[in-house]
Amino acid sequence: RQMCIRDSTYTIEDIYALPEGERAELIDGQIYYMAPPSRKHQRISTRLTSIIDRYIEDHQGQCQVYAAPFAVYLDESTNTYVEPDISVICDPNKLNDKGCNGAPDWIIEIVSPASKRMDYYTKLFKYRTAGVKEYWIVDPDKSRIIVYNFEQSTMDEYSFTDSVKAGIYNDLLIDFNVLSF
């Protein structure tokens, strides 16, 4: 159900005016409705958010992790609003009651059939140009994780049997093999 609804340009105000419970993202003035996530999607999101949060706590880190729904305004424009599945923000000045103003340091998107094109193409470009440092695409259907480290200009692919190192941290290794989804 992820589809664009018209050719004219929408703004953040149109997102705020959506009926209660209706989830959508705004990218370059186009509204994309979001299908409800599957159980497996939510399980992956919960597990990864928990691991990252525990790591930050154990290391007295200043970063904060947020799971969707969490508003991210990538830039100063009023025509882009996204809700990444997982956002890690290390600059407290970017955070306010509405969400995050500016690019998170690390974003994880968990692919669903309806979000595939957005996660692999549209958001990849938006996140890179906005200044996100690291972007993970977790694809349950393909049992793979694609890790983009924009600061290093690298892209690596892993499977659900691998341990994956987070680029923004020196020693955070997430072992997908022991995670039960």
Spans of features found by a protein language model:
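Gly/Pro/Ser/Thr-rich low-complexity, intrinsically disordered segments predominantly at protein N-termini
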Residues: 2, 6-181
